[in-house]
């Protein structure tokens, strides 16, 4: 009985101290002629030895004054083992901060070690669509669990 309890405690201790990595990559910026811009950020998390990594890539659309108007986030889960990587789950979400904006279209797909999403947003002024912006998001995992 003592051996069983010791074994159980050893497993519990091993599981509870497995480090979980959370990494927020550098923020990239894409500017438009009117002064508005996208900020793009990749975040990833996953236990080092688990062979599973969850990543998000977020495009935030900002006005020329720096106000966030909406964001599109693609979230993917990958498995990897040093010789291959596969996207196992995916989702795409849109958060709207300014009520002038609405979702025109949204799609997501996964294929092998990559996942893509496309979000087109429209802006209505006085009930008429005045502009549209599209965010094309692609997230890829290499065989070592590195996201790009």
Role assignments for model-derived ranges:
Residues 1-67:
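N-terminal prepro-regions of secreted/extracellular proteins
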Residues 44-148:
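Mature secreted bioactive peptide module from preproproteins
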């Amino acid at each position: 009985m003592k051996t069983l309890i010791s074994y159980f405690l050893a497993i519990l201790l091993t599981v509870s101290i497995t480090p979980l990595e959370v990494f927020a990559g550098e923020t990239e910026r894409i500017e438009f002629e009117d002064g508005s811009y996208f900020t793009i950020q990749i975040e990833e998390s996953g236990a080092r030895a688990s062979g599973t990594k969850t990543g998000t890539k977020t495009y935030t659309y900002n006005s020329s004054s720096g106000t966030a108007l909406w964001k599109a986030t693609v979230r993917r889960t990958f498995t990897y083992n040093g010789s291959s990587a596969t996207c196992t789950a995916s989702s795409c979400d849109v958060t709207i901060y300014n009520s002038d904006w609405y979702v025109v279209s949204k799609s997501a797909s996964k294929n092998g070690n990559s996942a893509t999403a496309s979000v087109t947003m429209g802006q209505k002024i006085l009930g008429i669509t005045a502009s549209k912006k599209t965010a094309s998001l692609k997230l890829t995992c290499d065989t070592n669990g590195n996201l790009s």
